Amino acid sequence: MSAAQSPTAQHAHAEDPVVQALFARFGQHVFVAQATHTGMPVLWLDREYLLEVLNFLRDMPEPFEMLFDLHGIDERLRSHREDLPPADFTVFYQLMSISRNRDIMLKVALSERDLEVPSVAGVYPNANWYEREVWDMFGIDFRGHPHLTRLLMPPTWNGHPLRKDYPARATEFDPYTLTVEGQSTEQEALRFDPEAWGMQRQSENTDYMFLNLGPNHPSAHGAFRIALQLDGEVVVDCVPDIGYHHRGAEKMAERQSWHSYIPYTDRIDYTGGVMNNLPYVMAVEKLAGIEVTDRAKTIRVMMAEMFRINSHLLFLGTYLQDLGAMTPVFFTFTDRQKAYEVIEGITGFRMHPAWYRIGGTAHDLPRGWDKLVQGFLDWMPKRLVEYERAMMENAIIRERTKQVAAFTTREALEWGVTGPNLRATGCDFDLRKQRPYSGYENFDFEVPLGANGDVFDRGQLRIDEMRQSLRIIQQCVDHMPAGDYKADHPLTTPPPREKMLQHIETLITHFLQVSWGPVLKPNESLSMIEATKGINSYYLTADGNTMSYRTRIRTPSFPHLQQIPAAVRGALVPDLIAHLGSIDFVMADVDR
């Protein structure tokens, strides 16, 4: 691949052992290195080498077992592409190695006249949905894909929304109308066609029944449909159908300033609250060169763990409800109310505080915050004991969950499973330990693990995680650092209020950053966190402007739903419901 490499990029990757192995196997001329703030090697290559390179990385000693993310970028309006190969569009592949505890990103440059790249679904099975989404959003063709169809948009949709020439506002479209004929067309387009998915309507001994579970079903946990192929009560196969909750979150980031996009992050996993803010603001802080104060880091950790408990309580109640236990959800919601009282007392809001800021938090901790938090810490441990005794030790629940919808660590990694669902298989990988961020390296806590990767382990593990979250929060209360809640940096947005009220320069900066937005230098950054449901990451592309050129949001729930057919083939329908309850997803996290 021909492109001049900057000395910075060459130096950034020269000593990396994986890059050296690639250079030794394929030749340095095949790759172009890019210097970024992503924290991993970034290499461009021609598409004819893609499959061979991916196979090499997957099969090497200490392999890259997981395709963590795959998506695209419309490069046509990007102003700052110095030292990068010519490209109208880019497809990127982020690979993760659990054994090496490191990532690598590969990029393929494409011309608008030839938007085609080979499918990698034969190398990494979870590439299937990612490639469908890239085709849906950008119109890039993946040669050899088994079923390249719309994923998030309706089957009848025209255009590819993440292209730069596609409108970003509803006011740029004609007023929406739906005629009777149009409604019939849309309904017919949603009719499930088994043959299109390679399914048979009958076997030698039976006629299969096809059943829609959802998109409006209590156990679907949102607007979500699964088309089931059934032999009696046995699930022969199934096809998850997503997109009903798609809101264009990545597109909206292209018309919001770095600061004003924060409230949108709250609503990706709407049960995670400020946990969603964290990877975004950390990625922006990398671009801005902001080092957050120890106090701000600790406050962020404390509130993130509060929302982890809050989310896990919601999971526990609905998980048990899906198994037929109707009472527990009322107990867990009582505890969630107590958590919300703490959250509201500190941030001023409940579900969607949008409280983290570029450089810190919206304001400092209020007077009496420690007593408020301590009251919750004193309350919860005995409740977790009750949940375990009354529910997880219940013989009926154990019978319904043990060895049901089990999968191995290898299978989990192949499908991109992260978080508690991965750790339930016995895989000891938690970003808070393996790649500490926001000061997690200063906390003493354990990472709970399962053994069987089944429905029971996924439930028990989240109870154990709540205990560890309480342990972390207690350390925050006992050792909260003194100091500022915001960094003293020109790009901290908004600037500290005390300085804004006393210095005209800071007042001017405040006005510009809030009304127009901070200007960040061209570069790319990526931040990953251990969110409530798994690993959540934001990959940001800055082009020297007040807003993001491209924002890629990788959520944990998306690959978890793609794995459903592999986990439940041969199971009974009630076991499918148990599995759905155990993987802990919300559709806003899937569809974005």
Swiss-Prot record:
Principal location: membrane
GO CC terms of this entry: NADH dehydrogenase complex; plasma membrane
Residue ranges, annotated region (NADH dehydrogenase I subunit C): 1-183
Binding partners and assembly: NDH-1 is composed of 13 different subunits. Subunits NuoB, CD, E, F, and G constitute the peripheral sector of the complex.
MF terms (GO), sorted A to Z: NAD binding; NADH dehydrogenase (ubiquinone) activity; NADH:ubiquinone reductase (non-electrogenic) activity; quinone binding
Membrane topology: Peripheral membrane protein
Protein family: In the N-terminal section; belongs to the complex I 30 kDa subunit family. In the C-terminal section; belongs to the complex I 49 kDa subunit family.
UniProt-annotated location(s): Cell inner membrane
PANTHER family: NADH-QUINONE OXIDOREDUCTASE SUBUNIT C_D, NADH-UBIQUINONE OXIDOREDUCTASE 49 KDA SUBUNIT
Function according to Swiss-Prot or TrEMBL: NDH-1 shuttles electrons from NADH, via FMN and iron-sulfur (Fe-S) centers, to quinones in the respiratory chain. The immediate electron acceptor for the enzyme in this species is believed to be ubiquinone. Couples the redox reaction to proton translocation (for every two electrons transferred, four hydrogen ions are translocated across the cytoplasmic membrane), and thus conserves the redox energy in a proton gradient.
Catalysed conversion reaction: a quinone + NADH + 5 H(+)(in) = a quinol + NAD(+) + 4 H(+)(out)
Protein's UniProt name: NADH-quinone oxidoreductase subunit C/D
Keyword Metal-binding: no
Record-linked Pfam families: Complex1_30kDa (PF00329), Complex1_49kDa (PF00346)
Residue ranges of the region described as NADH dehydrogenase I subunit D: 207-592
UniProt-listed HAMAP family: NDH1_NuoC, NDH1_NuoCD_1, NDH1_NuoD
EC number annotated for this UniProt entry: 7.1.1.-
Protein source organism: Chromohalobacter salexigens (strain ATCC BAA-138 / DSM 3043 / CIP 106854 / NCIMB 13768 / 1H11)
Keywords, in A-Z order: Cell inner membrane, Cell membrane, Membrane, Multifunctional enzyme, NAD, Quinone, Translocase, Transport, Ubiquinone
